[in-house]
Amino acid sequence: MKVLLGLRLARIAVHLLFGLASLTPQQFRVLTMVCEGLLNKQIAYELSVSEATIKAHVTAIFRKLGVRTRTQAALLLQQLESISQH
């Protein structure tokens, strides 16, 4: 059972790593800001871009990570960070 759980976690980590590796530097910045709880409008202001640009980045991030919500994206990033600490 522990082996299966370990394999499942490894598969999740690999999927996340590929998803994260496919993000552009700007998309990764947006992802970290999303995970900090910032709204699209706030992120746009901080990065000096339009809110529409941020919406496009968020859509691309969700597609690449295979998630549908900001909460799911934040949880995936937290899971990856906790796996990498072990």
PLM features: what roles do these ranges have?
Residues 31-32, 45, 75:
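A cross-family signal for key residues in well-ordered alpha-helices
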Residues 34-38, 77:
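Short helix-to-turn junction characteristic of helix-turn-helix DNA-binding domains
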Residues 12, 23-24, 54, 69, ...:
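Intrinsic low-complexity/disordered segments
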Residues 4-33, 86:
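Regulatory hinge/linker segments at domain boundaries
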